[in-house]
Amino acid sequence: MTENQNVYDITIIGGGPTGLFTAFYGGMRQASVKIIESLPQLGGQLSALYPEKYIYDVAGFPKVRAQELVDNLKEQMKKFDPTICLEEAVETLEKQADGVFKLVTNKQTHYSKSVIITAGNGAFQPRRLELDGAQKFEKKNLHYFVDDMNKFARKRVVVFGGGDSAVDWTLMLEPIAEQVTIIHRRDKFRAHEHSVENLINSRADIKTPYVPVELIGEEQIEQVVLQHVKTEEKVVIDVDDVIVNYGFVSSLGPIKNWGLNIQKNSIVVNSKMETNIPGIYAAGDVCTYEGKVKLIACGFGEAPTAVNNAKAYFDPSAKLQPMHSSSMF
């Protein structure tokens, strides 16, 4: 039972673009809303993987930078001040005898009248740097995410990786850092050709094909030892910060154990965006139905459907069809 517990109207699992818009819309329906996100920042893959890439298929935007879209969604959502829980992964989800959902994460327990899952392709975690002692530098000056570029101003930054994320972060940091060095184990980068061209024409130091073999430092990383893949020549670089962009591993993980109808790694929903468990809804890339198309734009359309039906679920007196937003503010 959930007496004396703080029970939210809607708890959203996943803080990507669909989750952020779901939170805004839930607030607009005068619901108390909580977002639980496994990453240390909101924005999902847009923020973590390609913040500087342009998106061209969001209605009303001829083009919009991924991080700009996330920032706008966060600003829109702030109007209703939802509760945000970062670096929390939901491990179990169950409906109690009183109908309230109990969500247990790696940090705490949450209670909610309804749940909307907007987890994209599932919780995803970075591929970590597999060097002795690397873990002790995490949350110091070894980074897998960048939430504020300004903290790298006038610093010597090393970026590991050869894909879009690594090249994007190098280009973004190049104007503000004292020096940016990008390290890739292959001769050629996997990033978009235009981005690679910009990288070559920037003042960033490019070292290929090299791999890191040692991190030197006590409290923080002070030097990185690199080894040439072919000649095995070693180079030592002085650093202030290290950013690792080796990609991410995503998985539905514990979601598969919650009793939901899952087909081809997606949660099956009906026209209400409702799962096979009443009170649990899904929207965005994590869900599937006949004719489903996995696009951000589609997730934005599914979010209001999920919220309005969730509202009617936990408050049967509420109207399913809301007022138009132009009449509300």
Swiss-Prot record:
Keyword Oxidoreductase: yes
UniProt xrefs under SUPFAM superfamilies: FAD/NAD(P)-binding domain
EC number in record: 1.18.1.2
Keyword hit for NADP: yes
Swiss-Prot/TrEMBL cofactor(s): FAD
Catalytic activity of the protein: 2 reduced [2Fe-2S]-[ferredoxin] + NADP(+) + H(+) = 2 oxidized [2Fe-2S]-[ferredoxin] + NADPH
InterPro entries xrefs: FAD/NAD-bd_sf, FAD/NAD-binding_dom, Fd--NADP_Rdtase_type_2, Ferredoxin-NADP_redctase_2
Short name of any one Pfam family annotated for the protein: Pyr_redox_2
Keywords, in A-Z order: FAD, Flavoprotein, NADP, Oxidoreductase
Annotated cofactor note: Binds 1 FAD per subunit.
GO molecular function list: ferredoxin-NADP+ reductase activity; flavin adenine dinucleotide binding; NADP binding
Record note on quaternary structure: Homodimer.
Similarity comment: family membership: Belongs to the ferredoxin--NADP reductase type 2 family.
Stated name of the protein: Ferredoxin--NADP reductase 2
Organism of provenance: Bacillus cytotoxicus (strain DSM 22905 / CIP 110041 / 391-98 / NVH 391-98)
Taxonomic lineage of the native organism: Bacteria, Bacillati, Bacillota, Bacilli, Bacillales
